Amino acid sequence: MTGEGAARADIAWPPGDGRRALDPAFLLVLTHGSGGGPGSADLLAVRDAALPLGAAVALVTQPYRVKGRRAPGSPDRQDAAWIEIVDAVRDAAGPDLPLVQGGRSNGARVACRTARATGARAVLALAFPLHPPGHPEKSRAAELALAGTDVLVINGSRDPFGIPDQAARTRVVVLDGETHALSKKPETAGATAGAWLAGLPGLVHP
């Protein structure tokens, strides 16, 4: 429960020996875009790439979507609810686990804006919506900088919401032919995210 109402988090655990899951090496918390849900192909592909690395992966449905609304409302209230959600997921998965958080589209924005508050080691931003379609002057690039940590952006070359520029701690990967949905070859997004996670210092058990 958050100040905005109930959220839902489905946690998948790293595969074990057939009897029980392995103790996770890190926690990956992911969420959806404005009107979507956590079952999008790109989010599932990232989950499937992260589990063999030893991640516990939480797919989060935010309170406004649990209520059936499509618009997230105030960013401040959305961010406050997200911080509460991450705290609860960490309690369930292991409060001392290194945290990586992320999402697609609007969820990527939330993950960037709250990374400092949650203590995230890194942020994964799928289909980061740099600006509203047709309005490049309304840039949201500053939200990427708010993360204050390593960020991986995975966007499609045909995304009408634009593509961010590389920055000191922001790596941008552009998938040729993909739109904002990243649904043409979601396994490519998953593999890209998995390789990045595997390369983050101290995150994956040797």
Identify the meaning behind each predicted range:
Residues 1-98, 110:
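Serine-hydrolase catalytic machinery in alpha/beta-hydrolase-like enzymes
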Residues 62-63, 125-133, 156-158:
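Active-site nucleophile loop of the alpha/beta-hydrolase fold
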Residues 103-111:
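Gly/Ala-rich beta-loop-alpha elbow adjacent to hydrolase catalytic centers
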Residues 110-114, 134:
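Hydrolases whose catalytic domains are alpha/beta-hydrolase-1, hotdog thioesterase
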Residues 146-148, 153-155, 159:
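Short beta-strand/loop motif that positions the catalytic acidic residue
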Residues 178-191:
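Catalytic histidine-centered segment of alpha/beta-hydrolase-like enzymes
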